[in-house]
Amino acid sequence: MADRPVRGSRTGRPIMALLDLLGRRWTLRILWELRDGALTARALRSACDDASPTVLQARLAELRAAGLVEHAAGRGYGLSEEGREFLTAFMPLYAFAERWAASKPTTPG
């Protein structure tokens, strides 16, 4: 069974669309900030203090289109069920990548 084309992906493949989305600045930070509960756009801007409101709104729109984030009036933005599953599955790999990037490679002397 062939994969359906995915809007927003350069290749049309779902996994590549997800990687494209994750490669955009602030995407993972937004998901991480939403892990404990819903936040307003203002609270997210405070948590992501280097992001402009325009960039955050663009990332939130992409995350909503991907089905990872929901928006409820009066409650703010929160993770969808798929977003929670994704974060649970992805964060060990993300934590490993962060540790690996922080370690200094040894050079042969």
Give short role names for the model-derived ranges.
Residues 59-105:
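Charged, amphipathic alpha-helical coiled-coil/dimerization segments
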Residues 2-3, 10-14, 32, 88-109:
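Amphipathic alpha-helical dimerization/coiled-coil segments
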Residues 8-55, 66-68, 77-84, 107-109:
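N-terminal helix-turn-helix DNA-binding core of bacterial DNA-binding proteins
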